[in-house]
């Protein structure tokens, strides 16, 4: 019966998506990003990139260069790529859903759902290979694991890049990741410092599994991806999808970028049995799909297709502003966010291979950047940022254009 109900929900969401009136997005007919980025593509330093600027229903889409330089395959908005840590925001949305529904509180102890976290130990010191541990005094909460103040390392031992089948998309499923983390010493007392951690976000996803009785990736698909029409996003892209993969490259100073077959933190084959859903970094997507998610955040929980994912107040209070104590930097639930929300505040996230998307819900602005690059330097960043400023100023100067507000009554 539960399975049948889920299938009916998916069917209903699909029907709503197909019947809803899509918001009109006008082409800006500008080339700010293309003009800024083309010289770097011509030099070979930038293999290929996707850049999107959006404000009030006016959008500039730019695809320059190649998804595969050797094959001379142009990069497109429908090519799949690994967004790495941008996956964290998707976990944040699923946590926010459960808070909105009254099923969890951000200040609930993690041990309420995962008993293995009842007693935790903190590494006090280490000398001559001997570690001294002390029992944790503070209660580890859901809020802490989602905003990187829980005290966990970046990745657990099973997900290190030097392990075959490891990396953030391999190593272990979510519940096993949580169990390993619970049995390992914390780096500091929970809630007292910041340590960027995929592990903490994976623990958050494991809590979603306990509360919902579903694998996290299934809950995400049914409650977020399918309702928004994000049909190209998954943790295991198909062989057919991978034919459109944006290939990975290493940045080289003053020289063309160098092809990289894989990074050890993202090991081939990308859809093999060693691949597990990682909430910290693991969701493949396309630029068109990613826009649907971030426009939903920009529109305070409402997808461009008219499907509501979260209430406005949920996005404002849980995602668009920091959930950390003051002075620890801005971060909410899997998303970079301002300590204090204001009309100039942006929230969103970036990923290890250079992707990012940020939104300003007050001004209905969005900027998306998609590349698959490792290392430095990245001399095009300044040029892209200048192009972004030019675009937003252009839209302000042409504000008489009928704009989509992002709201559906």
Predicted feature locations:
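Bacterial N-terminal signal peptides that target proteins for export
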Residues: 1-9
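Bacterial N-terminal signal peptides
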Residues: 9-18
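Boundary at the C-terminal end of the N-terminal hydrophobic targeting segment
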Residues: 21-25
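Short, conserved catalytic-motif segment at the N-terminal edge
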Residues: 26-83, 103, 119-126
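Active-site SXXK
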Residues: 37, 56-57, 82-110, 204-209, ...
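Short, surface-exposed loop or secondary-structure junction motifs
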Residues: 121-345
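Short, gly/Ser/Thr-rich active-site loops of penicillin-recognizing serine hydrolases
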Residues: 299, 313-314, 319-327, 340, ...
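Short, well-ordered beta-strand elements
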Residues: 357-358, 364-377
